[in-house]
Design a protein with these regions (language model features):
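Extracytoplasmic/lumenal domain signature
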Residues: 1-115
Length: 115
């Protein structure tokens, strides 16, 4: 075994710009160097926000939350660089395609976005 984590997650890990990341079941984001597997940064500001799947878009990590916000996070620093409310309902799924990304809320409404 090369690496393991005790984090419990609903989503598969993401790898972006040399960072391996996990969103835990309680919405804490933990990242590790994809080369050495040492801790990189941890982000606890989204704990209990019921984050959606992580999605890569234009070099950022995107996540949706239970209040209908989408957050863009720098994968190298863990700093939230943008945030936008797109729904009054929980964002359940994010999908990125070329120059746009799509968010689906719990009422199955589809939002097409870009930045």
């Amino acid at each position: 075994m090369v690496w393991e984590s005790q984090e419990s997650s609903f989503y598969e890990p993401f790898i972006l710009r040399g960072v391996l990341g996990i969103i835990s079941a309680d919405s804490k984001i933990s990242t590790y160097s994809s080369r050495t597997f040492e801790d990189s940064w941890k982000l606890e500001e989204y704990v209990l926000r019921e984050l959606s799947n992580p999605e890569e878009f234009k070099g950022y990590i995107l996540v949706g939350d239970l209040e209908g916000y989408i957050h863009a996070i720098d994968p190298l620093t863990g700093i939230t660089v943008a945030r936008k409310k797109v729904s009054r309902n929980k964002i359940t799924t994010l999908i990125s395609r070329s120059d746009s990304f799509y968010a689906i809320d719990e009422k199955m409404r589809l939002f097409s976005l870009s930045f």
